[in-house]
Regions:
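Sec-dependent signal peptide recognition
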Residues: 1-8
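Periplasmic peptidoglycan-binding/tethering modules of Gram-negative envelope proteins
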Residues: 17-68, 126, 139-141
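Short loop/turn segments at strand-loop or loop-helix junctions that form parts
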Residues: 40, 72-75
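Short beta-strand/loop motifs in extracellular/secreted proteins, especially
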Residues: 68-70, 108
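Periplasmic OmpA-like peptidoglycan-binding domain that tethers envelope proteins to the cell wall
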Residues: 75-141
């Protein structure tokens, strides 16, 4: 009976041990390795054909190492004012997150955030271009 209980507890603990640790994207823009740019048309949050190759590269970089996670940073320039641009940046990030999850990347390995030219000098300088989502695959801890 005791052995069965221990086996059961071990099985229940397995998924908890496999979960990705919480992470944040503060400073992700400063990293230079495993950074991918996914383009969008002006005013759009729909993925186009040009997104296919960088999305494949993101999935390859994430691989099966559950310690690797991705910061998905949506950008929008001055496309309709501050509120509209931050909303568009968030929609773009969410679109990429949904597409990656749809291709099998667990959502707990993805974090999407919006970046706005009003709050980010890098976006204001158009590096990366303001009509992109930047995906930064973080190194495993």
């Amino acid at each position: 009976m005791m052995i069965r209980l221990l086996v059961l507890l071990g099985l229940l603990a397995g998924p908890a041990l496999a979960e990705t640790a919480p992470f944040n994207c503060v400073g992700a823009e400063q990293l230079e390795d495993d950074v991918f740019s996914i383009p969008f048309a002006r005013g759009s949050s729909r993925l186009g054909d040009a997104a296919r190759s960088p999305m494949d590269a993101v999935i390859e970089a994430l691989g099966t190492d559950t310690g690797r996670v991705a910061c998905i940073l949506g950008h929008a320039g001055q496309e309709g004012g501050a509120t509209t641009s931050i909303r568009l940046a968030a929609e773009r990030a969410r679109t990429v997150t949904d597409a990656l999850a749809g291709r099998g990347v667990p959502r707990d390995r993805l974090r999407s955030e919006a970046r706005s030219a009003q709050f980010s000098p890098r976006v204001r300088a158009a590096l990366p271009p303001s009509r992109t989502v930047t995906v930064v695959v973080l190194p495993a801890p």
